[in-house]
Amino acid sequence: TTAWSIGSFTATQTPHQFSAGIEDGPDEHFADMEKFAAKDAHRDNLALRRIFVDNASETLRWLMSFGVEFFGPMPEPPHVKARMHNVLPNSRTYIRLLGGHATKIGVDIKYNFRAERFLVDGNRVTGIEGTGPQGVVKFRARATVLASGDFAASEALKSKYISNAVARVDAMNPTA
C-alpha cells in the first residue's frame, strides 16, 4: 500500500528543519505523538515510539542517500512544530528508488506471492514456501523478509486487532 499512501515522514533535526530555522528534537516529537491518539494514547507502545523519534532523522537522511527527495517540513497539527516531510513527487518514489537499489544489490523480490510457511533449520528461518503464479514454490535464502500490505480495508482484522469502533471506519485505500 506504499504506492497509495501520501508518503509523509515526520522527523526532527533534519536538514529541512535546520534550513527553516526550526529548533526541534526527539523529546518534543515524542510528546506530540500521543496527541494524535488522544483518549487512546494509553494503548501506545512507548518503547517503539521512543525508537522511532530517536531514529527518524537518521532514517530520513538514509532515504535521501538513495535519492529520495522531500518537501517541507510542513505543519501537521497537533504537532507544535513543522516536522512533516513529504516525498517528491509522490510515494511511488520509495518503491522505485529503494526497490531499484534492492534489485541492484541482488535482492530477489517476489510479487503476487502468498507466503504460507517459513522454512526453518532449528531456530533459523532459511526460506519460505508459498503459492505464486507458478503454483507452490519453495525459496531458500540467507535472509528472508516477509512484507505485505496493510489490513485497513478488512473490517474483520481491524475488529480483531484494534477495536469494533475502528473496524467500522472506511479505509483510505479500499483495496488494501
What are these regions (language model features)?
Residues 3-108, 112-117, 156-165:
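Conserved N-terminal/central alpha/beta ligand/cofactor-binding core
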